[in-house]
């Protein structure tokens, strides 16, 4: 995909016909990605969550929880999550933070306490500050099991626990809002076809090492993020707007395969069957 984008944007020298073809292909790819994203959200909200509820598994979808869980969340956050959080300031044209490939971050907008701004108008005239904070997956699971209540089991996203306690991270600020973001970096390996075998090996070694620090080829963000918030991040991280992909509130939904099964009511599929693609004729080769 990155190769076609390079042609479409003129980064790679190509004739006009190749550029137009690449632009059309990139557009079709983006449309398909967005279609699949919408379908995934629909399946999650209309099938997975109701199925969990039928098995007495309540999966909180926001920072708002039942009163009997509030003290647990405060304690869990303070003891298990807070020690691993490292907010990094984002300052356009002054500080450029490096976002790691395929990692979830929380983008946060806040205002210094004492900055009154325009009287009678919330946040108007106040100077916002921005931070990003990587979710500590290597230290804490993405999905947290909360204490059982009655016959129900409860689960929660780690990012929602952080949002519920975010004021304690920034005691000198009024937190305005926070949203999940994620970037994907260019992982394509383009090889000089004229190189000999030894040169190709060295090219591959060099390019593999750089895959995690390659150029940003996709910036996924919570579609509920206000336009001015998104504009700031795009400018601060120097994101090409063609790489923007609106997502849902919770990103990296492939992590659902690690969802806890507290009452063993959800039967895991040990040998998942491949999906049948009706658009392909099994009698013909797709390479013809």
Question: Where are these predicted regions, by residue range?
Answer:
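N-terminal localization/anchoring segments of enzymes in phospholipid and broader phosphate metabolism
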Residues: 1-288
């Amino acid at each position: 995909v990155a190769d076609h984008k390079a042609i479409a944007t003129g980064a790679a020298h190509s004739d006009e016909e190749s550029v137009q073809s690449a632009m059309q292909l990139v557009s079709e790819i983006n449309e398909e990605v967005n279609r699949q994203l919408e379908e995934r959200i629909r399946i999650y909200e209309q099938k997975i969550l109701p199925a969990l509820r039928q098995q007495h598994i309540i999966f909180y979808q926001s920072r708002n929880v039942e009163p009997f869980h509030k003290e647990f969340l405060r304690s869990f956050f303070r003891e298990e999550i807070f020690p691993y959080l490292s907010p990094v300031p984002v300052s356009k044209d002054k500080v450029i933070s490096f976002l790691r490939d395929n990692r979830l971050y929380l983008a946060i907008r806040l205002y210094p306490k004492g900055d009154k701004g325009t009287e009678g108008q919330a946040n108007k005239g106040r100077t916002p500050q921005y931070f990003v904070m990587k979710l500590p997956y290597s230290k804490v699971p993405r999905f947290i099991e909360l204490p059982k209540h009655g016959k129900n089991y409860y689960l929660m996203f780690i990012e929602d626990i952080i949002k519920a306690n975010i004021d304690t991270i920034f005691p000198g600020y009024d937190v305005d809002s926070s949203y999940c973001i994620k970037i994907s970096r260019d992982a394509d390996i383009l090889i000089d076809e004229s190189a000999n075998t030894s040169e190709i090996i060295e090219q591959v070694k060099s390019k593999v090492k750089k895959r995690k620090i390659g150029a940003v080829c996709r910036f996924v963000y919570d579609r509920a993020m206000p336009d001015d918030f998104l504009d700031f991040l795009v400018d601060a991280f120097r994101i090409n707007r063609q790489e923007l992909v609106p997502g849902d509130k919770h990103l990296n939904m492939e992590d659902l395969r690690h969802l806890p099964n507290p009452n063993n009511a959800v039967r895991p599929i040990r040998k998942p069957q491949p999906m049948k693609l009706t658009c392909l004729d099994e009698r013909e080769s797709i390479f013809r």
